[in-house]
Amino acid sequence: MRVWVGIDDTDSSRGMCTTYLAVLAMERVERELGKVIGFPRLIRLNPTIPYKTRGNGAVSFLVEVDDVGELVDVVNEVIIEHAMLDDEKTNPGAVFVDEELAVKLKPFADKAIKDVLQIDEALFVIGKYFIPHLRHKKGRGLIGALAAVGAELEDFTLELIAYRYPERFGTEREYDEESFFDMDYELYPQTFDNVDWCNDVVVCIPNTPCPVLYGIRGESVEALYKAMESVKTEPVDRRMIFVTNHATDMHLIGEEEVHRLENYRSYRLRGRVTLEPYDIEGGHVFFEIDTKFGSVKCAAFEPTKQFRNVIRLLRKGDVVEVYGSMKKDTINLEKIQIVELAEIWVEKNPICPSCGRRMESAGRGQGFRCKKCRTKADEKLREKVERELQPGFYEVPPSARRHLSKPLIRMNVEGRHIFR
């Protein structure tokens, strides 16, 4: 029989990675029980959830086995051996879903990616469909485990994750930084968001004590294998390609889908600038827009680097569409579309038609005159200010991009101002 296995919340800030644990489980299945079908899936969930470990990702994979009970036992053994169970914030969960049942979990998965779920909701679904499951400690991982099985990917990308040898876990990673930039130069945009040229950073290598050496994102298996062959690193213990919802904007809720805004959700909102950008201590930039929901504060925080310079050019009356997550009643910007620029006019003293110099005031209520030619004029001139900003899409650099946020290179839109 064919069964989807979903696993989540096995890691902590001190180590482990659910993708790595899933790979270990897949290897056990292949050795002892049956076979794994296709690539595993890495499904990123709501990025604003406060109790996430790092990227809030859950894993699922499809297997063909004779005995589900034996499958449950093997996965449980892997979790007990490798999950960070001694961390109070780690609460693993795993589910075992018949392949034909998986489609019924789509509504739950959609909510896990866009909304906020409680463990009771996961337990209700498990009870409704009599789903075999594993629940360690609080079992919060059951939410992600179900979502990883039920998510339907109309759009998807791939990620090749290379893992370190266990004896190297927690030590400094060894790699040739230049080789990653060379790889990107050669393969972009078939691979993407692996380096940040603007800020000279390799972004596909974590700085946590987890088993991951690097995770290269791309659009095809062929491109990922080429990338793997071209980068220079310490020896790789094992590797796996995951099908994922990275870079899809799957977390965004359109303004037409809701009647009110809530914290810990991500939105796409259109509005008109009502309060011009201002900086606060720390280099964060804020502005406000008027939307169908009322006034909404938006922010480009310091890690977005050059993107803040775009935001600083906004002016009152500009029409924009913002993309980002809401926390503390503020949209944390991931990208922005400048839909329409407001016309800005200034009044200046007229120019002398004879000599081309700017005229001076002739006195209160007496108009203007040229000091040299004595030419006179009655009124000031209204001049349109040339805006530095252009309509189109602007995005944060790769080093500040969230897993789910779709980079402009993957968007078929006009006026893309790509940070690479």
From Swiss-Prot:
One of its GO terms (biological process) is tRNA wobble cytosine modification. GO terms for molecular function: ATP binding; ligase activity, forming carbon-nitrogen bonds; nucleic acid binding. Residues 268-329 bind DNA. Changing residue 248 to A: Decrease in activity. InterPro entries: NA-bd_OB_tRNA, TiaS, TiaS-like_TCKD, TiaS_FLD, tRNA_Ile2__agm2C_synt, Zn_ribbon_TiaS. Changing residue 249 to A: Decrease in activity. Its main location: cytoplasm. It comes from the Archaea. It is found in: Cytoplasm. Keywords: ATP-binding, Cytoplasm, Ligase, Nucleotide-binding, tRNA processing. Its EC number is 6.3.4.22. GO terms for cellular component: cytoplasm. It is an enzyme of class 6 (ligase). It catalyses: cytidine(34) in tRNA(Ile2) + agmatine + ATP + H2O = 2-agmatinylcytidine(34) in tRNA(Ile2) + AMP + 2 phosphate + 2 H(+). PANTHER family: TRNA(ILE2) 2-AGMATINYLCYTIDINE SYNTHETASE TIAS. ATP-dependent agmatine transferase that catalyzes the formation of 2-agmatinylcytidine (agm2C) at the wobble position (C34) of tRNA(Ile2), converting the codon specificity from AUG to AUA. Belongs to the TiaS family. NCBIfam families: tRNAmod_TiaS. This is tRNA(Ile2) 2-agmatinylcytidine synthetase TiaS.
